[in-house]
UniProtKB/Swiss-Prot annotation:
UniProt-listed InterPro entries: His_Pase_superF_clade-1 (IPR013078), His_PPase_superfam (IPR029033), Mito_Ser/Thr_phosphatase (IPR051021)
Source organism phylogeny: Eukaryota, Metazoa, Ecdysozoa, Arthropoda, Hexapoda
Protein name stated in the entry: Serine/threonine-protein phosphatase Pgam5, mitochondrial
Record bears the keyword Acyltransferase: no
UniProt keyword list: Hydrolase, Membrane, Mitochondrion, Mitochondrion outer membrane
SMART domains to which the protein is assigned, alphabetical: PGAM
Species whose genome carries this gene: Drosophila grimshawi
């Protein structure tokens, strides 16, 4: 009996020592910190509520004092600037295209790209959305994609807006850098300012007078869409190249009345047949490999 007791005590002591040692394992302490509510939030994780410079509080003259009359004035002005409804922005990447020739005029959709656009149009039709605006990049491949989509949805082609700000480009040097794609620094300065201007033009909370949720369809390009996603969600903009989206895919972002932004779809292409899934220019049709 004494031997059994000694054995049991030794076993318990050994297990206790092992457990205490495991608790002090630095790797486990790091894992525990991920769920520790007392851990300070990183500055880069904090949400900027005035990201679009349209936070109602930023549009109203601040309180001068605590007088009831002044508070009534402030609250009355604030109410006039508060949005009531959400905005939905649906981004479509153009279909597969041929990169032949030196100008955009020769960059037409492939047969597969046209099929992709048709499926996307049918998918948008199935969603039953009533479109408030349709906007397209003025590059040929985006124009052709938009034209095919418009054959499938209920929207007057005469009301489509063509926007040069949405043209494809190099928005910002990516992190981590990649060896196969190194635009000149001047291209980032030129394209980056334009693409950022496009973001500010189309991404903002609703106007106070908007009485119903709105739906805006934008047909554009892979780099621009990925940059928009990072900016809208307040992720580091340099992370845009870590995201991959297929041709003719659907990305859906919602800007709530409060200004909070959420993503519903990111590069959704599950409605396309497997044989139509592509995300790069056909290798035999590229000017530069």
């Amino acid at each position: 009996m004494r031997k059994f007791t000694a054995f049991a005590c030794g076993t318990i002591a050994g297990l206790s020592a092992y457990y205490i040692q495991r608790l002090n394992d630095p790797q486990l302490r790091v894992h525990n910190s991920w769920t520790n509510s007392e851990t300070p939030i990183s500055d880069c994780a904090l949400w900027n509520s005035n990201w679009d410079f349209r936070d109602p509080k930023s549009l109203v003259r601040p309180l001068k004092n605590d007088n009831p009359q002044e508070q009534n004035r402030y609250n009355s002005e604030l109410e006039k600037h508060v949005p009531k409804k959400a905005r939905h922005i649906i981004l479509i990447r153009h279909g597969e295209y041929l990169d032949v020739g030196d100008t955009d005029d020769s960059h037409h959709l492939t047969d597969r790209g046209r099929q992709q656009a048709k499926y996307t149009g049918q998918r948008l039709h199935e969603l039953g959305i009533t479109w408030d605006k349709v906007i397209a990049s003025n590059m040929v491949r985006a124009q052709e994609t938009a034209d095919i989509i418009l054959n499938e949805i209920d929207y007057d082609k005469a009301n489509v807006k063509n926007c040069p700000f949405l043209r494809e480009g190099a928005p910002i040097p990516p992190q981590p850098p990649v060896g196969h794609w190194k635009p000149e620094g001047s291209q980032f300065f030129r394209d980056g300012a334009r693409i950022e201007a496009a973001f500010r033009r189309y991404f903002h909370r609703a106007y106070p007078e908007q009485e119903k949720e709105s739906y805006t369809l934008i047909v554009g390009h892979g780099n621009v869409i990925r940059y928009f996603v990072c900016r809208a969600l307040q992720f580091p903009a340099e992370a845009w190249l870590r995201i991959s989206i297929n041709h003719a895919s659907i990305t859906w972002l919602t800007i709530s009345a409060s200004g909070n932004v959420s993503i519903k779809y990111l590069g959704d292409s599950g409605f396309l047949p497997a044989k139509l899934l592509t995300n790069r220019i056909p290798r035999d049709a590229k000017n530069v490999v």
